[in-house]
Amino acid sequence: HYDWAKVFRFFQQDNMLKSTFATKYPTRFKPELYELTPERNRIRVSLMPQKYSDVLEPYTDIISDRIQSIPNLQNYMEVHINYSPIIYEEGWLDEYRKLFQEVKDAGIDVKCECIFLTHNVHQHARNSEDVQKLLWKPDIQECKDSQYAADNIRYKWQLKRGMIEEFKALYAEFFDLSNIRYIF
């Protein structure tokens, strides 16, 4: 974990800078950080259906707690939702429907970033069997060379285009599409 006060103070050095960071631990955010130039700090609360979070990030804040933390964080700084990674599998839209309903029921309507699953091919050697079942779907995935020369896996672009449209259509049932800053 980082010394966030040090990071935030760095961004105070120049009026043109703004910090933005994603977290899976919004309930552990220290109150003293609220004082540090809140108008120049953006927190992106990472959300995914709890079913996926239980497998992929078992030691992080549970999704409902993350959602419930957002109104408090909004009192102090700009808050976005980071829907990432977006996982595709049978029934995936039902899982995201439940998630969007929970966010809407909490009265949250903020900008968001949406990122479909991309993962490093070498990670497969370290993944548990449950993680592998969720992440590794070679019939619908392809290799992608990253800008850092890593071998990454992502959903095939032809399929992903349709996934993005389905995700956006579902999102639009709950929120204004203009809330999506980017989706890929």
Each language-model region and where it sits:
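Active-site clefts of carbohydrate-active enzymes
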Residues: 85
